[in-house]
Amino acid sequence: KQELAVVALECSAQSMRHDTEKLLATDGSAYEIATAYLRRQRDVLKGCRMGRMTFDADVLNTPELIEPVKRTFVWLLEALTVLFERGRDQGEFVADIDARNLASLVVATVQGGYVLARATRDTDAFDAAVEGAAALLRKATVPLTTEVSDHSE
């Protein structure tokens, strides 16, 4: 039984990673990609298939079962950290942002949004969390200056 559970978790992890890799590989700024990740279509009331496993005592207490879950979230945090580092290094975000903290914000928002939506049976709770995180990310971006100053006298 445990072997089947491990295989099922590995399949879920692989599917989640594949979907996320595909999204992260799209064209666009780091902000656009991160907000696309936040806003992508999800079955909000069902929740995250990996995140749900962290509420299962059997999974938490069985190293072979929790490992694929842990590995998936570690990978996701790293992938988002790299995305935010790239954005910062390209001048898209303010220079002093902590890319790892932004990655954690995004992951925690999605996971917490699932919990809020499921607890209230209201997808608007998820949407509000996602839009709040997107607004915070927007505040971390460097505004594009389109004004050209005229120095002639």
Predicted regions and their residues:
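Hydrophobic alpha-helical connector segments
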Residues: 7, 14, 18-47, 99-106
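Amphipathic alpha-helical packing segments from all-alpha helical-bundle domains
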Residues: 11-18, 63-89, 100-104, 131
